[in-house]
């Protein structure tokens, strides 16, 4: 049994006239039904609400509408989209559930854990969770930006085995028009052809690559592949190969995956070279290695860890508020209680609560 996250974008779900492609949705649900009948657990991350709203109300000029109008039409379209999924999955005796999220649902660990428990309950009951960004309430500060990022974060939070980011081309295409079968971090200078966002979608290939890299770094076998060829889904689960594959790294523990990929940092800790070497050797971050503090945060918040030149090194859960941390910058651990005036932790960020960029 495998845990599979599938993301389909608006460019696959919507026809040129702006109407939902009902035939495609039925065929997609057939592939998902086959996987679930084999005992696999599946989560579908589906775009298309805004396009469905425009189509249902016979509106046009998708990119020209004001934000409030787009959000209103997303609310209308989400209902139509779920009706289609519910109807199509009923042919396989499978019920569906709707999950609408914003970035904040992942940034707060308690909410994230509640979300994960809900997801576990749904999949254990044989229900297909259908996930989308809550476009009707999302603002710029709490938006994912596109569903590629949402799918990646969801797969990481669920500890999925596979993530398929399905698009309208065969994978990541180089400038010669050929598919790159395997994407590796040592080939970051490879020539990748640019592709624009679709009329109805918000993400291009750059977004998909960023999302795929994050999932692979968390131990998830990931592919960017052609969603028009729905047989790619079963092929990837069976062979681990289709489209452009991002080989899994890790896995890492769930808590560190949340810190590294799902949390939203509240500030930044700038450290010296000695502290950098210490955390590279799996040692906790001490105040003596800190040179500068930025941001307003409380004890228990997630902060970025950067070298004093600004180089990003990782993230961690800090044991002090920003006000406290600024008082103990550069101090040795045995000086902390004298400066603060009360008993406190000797470490700024414990290694168990620290995610390194190279994890």
Swiss-Prot record:
Q: What is its main location?
A: cytoplasm
Record SUPFAM superfamilies: Carbamate kinase-like, PUA domain-like
**What is this enzyme's class at the first EC digit?**
transferase
Compartments in which it is found = Cytoplasm
Q: Which GO terms describe its biological process?
A: L-proline biosynthetic process
Sequence ranges assigned to domain PUA in this UniProt record: 266-343
The record's listing under InterPro entries reads: AceGlu_kinase-like_sf (IPR036393), Asp/Glu/Uridylate_kinase (IPR001048), G5K_ProB (IPR041739), Glu/AcGlu_kinase (IPR001057), Glu_5kinase (IPR011529), Glu_5kinase/COase_Synthase (IPR005715), Glutamate_5-kinase_CS (IPR019797), PUA (IPR002478)
Q: Which key words are in the record?
A: Amino-acid biosynthesis, ATP-binding, Cytoplasm, Kinase, Nucleotide-binding, Proline biosynthesis, Transferase
To which pathway does this protein belong?
A: Amino-acid biosynthesis; L-proline biosynthesis; L-glutamate 5-semialdehyde from L-glutamate: step 1/2
UniProt similarity note: Belongs to the glutamate 5-kinase family.
Q: Which PANTHER family does its entry note?
A: GLUTAMATE 5-KINASE, ISOPENTENYL PHOSPHATE KINASE
The record's function comment reads: Catalyzes the transfer of a phosphate group to glutamate to form L-glutamate 5-phosphate.
Q: Please identify the protein, giving its name as recorded.
A: Glutamate 5-kinase
Q: Which organism is it from?
A: Kosmotoga olearia (strain ATCC BAA-1733 / DSM 21960 / TBF 19.5.1)
Gene this protein is translated from: proB
């Amino acid at each position: 049994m495998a845990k599979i996250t599938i993301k389909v974008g608006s460019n696959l779900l919507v026809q040129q006239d702006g109407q939902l492609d009902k035939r495609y949705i039925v065929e997609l649900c057939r592939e998902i039904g086959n996987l679930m009948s084999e005992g696999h657990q599946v989560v579908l991350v589906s775009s298309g609400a805004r396009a469905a709203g425009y189509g249902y109300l016979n509106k046009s000029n998708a990119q020209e509408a004001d934000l409030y109008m787009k959000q209103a039409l997303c609310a209308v379209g989400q209902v139509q989209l779920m009706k289609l999924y519910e109807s199509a999955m009923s042919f396989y005796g499978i019920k569906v559930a709707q999950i609408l999220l914003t970035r904040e649902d992942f940034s707060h660990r308690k909410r994230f854990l509640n979300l994960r428990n809900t997801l576990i309950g749904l999949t254990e009951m044989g229900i297909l969770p259908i996930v989308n960004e809550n476009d009707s309430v999302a603002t710029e500060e709490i938006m994912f930006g596109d569903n590629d990022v949402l799918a990646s974060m969801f797969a990481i939070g669920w500890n999925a085995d596979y993530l398929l980011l399905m698009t309208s081309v065969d994978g990541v295409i180089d400038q010669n028009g050929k598919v790159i079968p395997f994407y590796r971090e040592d080939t970051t200078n490879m020539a990748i052809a640019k592709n624009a966002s679709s009329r109805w979608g918000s993400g291009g290939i750059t977004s998909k690559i960023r999302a795929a890299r994050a999932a692979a770094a968390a131990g998830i076998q990931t592919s960017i592949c052609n969603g028009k060829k729905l047989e790619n889904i079963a092929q990837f689960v069976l062979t681990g190969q289709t489209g452009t594959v991002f080989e899994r790294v890790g896995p890492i523990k769930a808590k560190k995956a949340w810190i590294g990929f799902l949390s939203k940092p509240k500030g930044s800790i700038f450290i010296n070279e000695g502290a950098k070497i210490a955390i590279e050797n799996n040692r906790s971050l001490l105040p003596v290695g800190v040179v500068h503090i930025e941001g307003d945060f409380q004890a228990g918040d997630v902060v970025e860890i950067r070298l004093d030149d600004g180089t990003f090194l990782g993230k961690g859960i800090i044991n002090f508020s920003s006000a406290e941390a600024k008082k103990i910058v550069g101090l040795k651990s045995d000086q902390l209680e004298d400066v603060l005036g009360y008993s406190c932790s000797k470490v700024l960020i414990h290694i168990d609560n620290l995610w390194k960029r190279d994890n």
